[in-house]
Amino acid sequence: METGIYIELSENDPREKNRSWGYVLEAPGGWTKHETGECTGTMHGVTLQILIKALGRYHKPSQITIHAADEWILNMLQNQLPAWEQNGFRNAHGEAIKYQQEWEQLAEKVKDHKITIAPGRHEYSAWLQDEMKRGR
């Protein structure tokens, strides 16, 4: 089944701060599900948390395209996650990577899916920004 996850943050400022977030799950036939909320964290940390939350809604192996403005997270997901997993989520110096627990959770969530990435703004960006402003 081919589906999409569309993630949006109220701000793409990399610093730790309180921010709103939202995601839309889109499935074949036009079915969608969305959720919004608020939390405190960095852009990368919040993007990881929301991605884990959205992937938690999948119960069957799927082909998923992940759309998000956080290009770094998407690139690490596609290109670095397997190496981190093999190295016990440690960097080249043997130190735990930043957001180690989140990356471990993400590795578990994506293992049964075929993931593709689409960095940048997406068709739900403006709508999710409006929903976040309304607090829905």
Language model segments and positions:
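Glycine-enriched catalytic-core subsegment of oxygenase/oxidase enzymes
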Residues: 52
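RNase H catalytic domain
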Residues: 11-15, 55-132
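Helix-coil modules at protein/domain termini and other flexible surface or pore-lining loops
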Residues: 35-36, 120, 134-136
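Short, low-complexity, polar/charged sequence segments that are solvent-exposed and flexible
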Residues: 24-27, 84-87, 135-136
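RNase H-like nuclease fold core
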Residues: 1-45, 49, 57
